[in-house]
Amino acid sequence: MILIGFDPGLGTTGWGVIAADGNRLSHVANGQIKTEPSMELSRRLYLLHSALAEIIRTYRPEAAAVEEVLGNSNAQSTLKLGQARGVVLLAAALAEVSVGEYHPSIVKKAVVGTGGAEKRQVQAMVKVLLPGAKLSGPDAADALAVAVTHAHHLASARAMRRVVA
């Protein structure tokens, strides 16, 4: 199963594609989509969507996952992050790809073992879980962590269905 994870942001959106075969995970690709702060907001969102649509067309994921937005004291930043996240959700929906959504602490716990893990710990564990992955940057590492989290959750759900059936 091909899964794609996203770490949304208006300035930088990370993406990561993995293949899940039972409990085995392997790295397929990752990257970061960047937009220029000097550009008009609508143009930045359009460029983000165009890049996401191309990535989804290229890798044809069966499922997607996105990190939830954490609010902060800067309402403008939170709003822009929410807009970028909306574009990510729209791109997946237009491609008819189902999306799992995960709080950052759930992603950290799934990958590192503790919900309070630091960014560098997440990056280190992504490299362990996906040997050979050349990370395009911290946002791409986070996106891969989101994809790994979704793979674990899907595997758990399948196991539960087998037990119940």
Swiss-Prot record:
The record lists Mg(2+) 2 as bound by: E67
Q: Where is the signal peptide?
A: none
Q: How and how many cofactors are bound, per the record note?
A: Binds 2 Mg(2+) ion per subunit.
Q: Where in the cell is it found?
A: Cytoplasm
Q: Which cofactor does it need?
A: Mg(2+)
- What are the protein's GO molecular function terms? crossover junction DNA endonuclease activity; DNA binding; magnesium ion binding
Report keywords, A-Z. Answer: Cytoplasm, DNA damage, DNA recombination, DNA repair, DNA-binding, Endonuclease, Hydrolase, Magnesium, Metal-binding, Nuclease
GO BP field: DNA recombination; DNA repair
InterPro entries to which the protein is assigned, alphabetical: RNaseH-like_sf, RNaseH_sf, X-over_junc_endoDNase_Mg_BS, X-over_junc_endoDNase_RuvC
The residues responsible for catalysis, as annotated, are D7, E67, D139
Q: Residues that bind Mg(2+) 1, according to the entry?
A: D7, D139
Q: Does the keyword Cytoplasm apply?
A: yes
Instruction: Provide the reaction this enzyme catalyses.
Output: Endonucleolytic cleavage at a junction such as a reciprocal single-stranded crossover between two homologous DNA duplexes (Holliday junction)
Q: What is its EC number?
A: 3.1.21.10
Q: Which Pfam families match?
A: RuvC
State the top-level EC class: hydrolase
GO cellular component: a single term: cytoplasm
Question: Family per UniProt?
Answer: Belongs to the RuvC family.
Subunit text? Homodimer which binds Holliday junction (HJ) DNA. The HJ becomes 2-fold symmetrical on binding to RuvC with unstacked arms; it has a different conformation from HJ DNA in complex with RuvA. In the full resolvosome a probable DNA-RuvA(4)-RuvB(12)-RuvC(2) complex forms which resolves the HJ.
What this chain does, per the entry, is described as: The RuvA-RuvB-RuvC complex processes Holliday junction (HJ) DNA during genetic recombination and DNA repair. Endonuclease that resolves HJ intermediates. Cleaves cruciform DNA by making single-stranded nicks across the HJ at symmetrical positions within the homologous arms, yielding a 5'-phosphate and a 3'-hydroxyl group; requires a central core of homology in the junction. The consensus cleavage sequence is 5'-(A/T)TT(C/G)-3'. Cleavage occurs on the 3'-side of the TT dinucleotide at the point of strand exchange.
Q: What is this protein called?
A: Crossover junction endodeoxyribonuclease RuvC
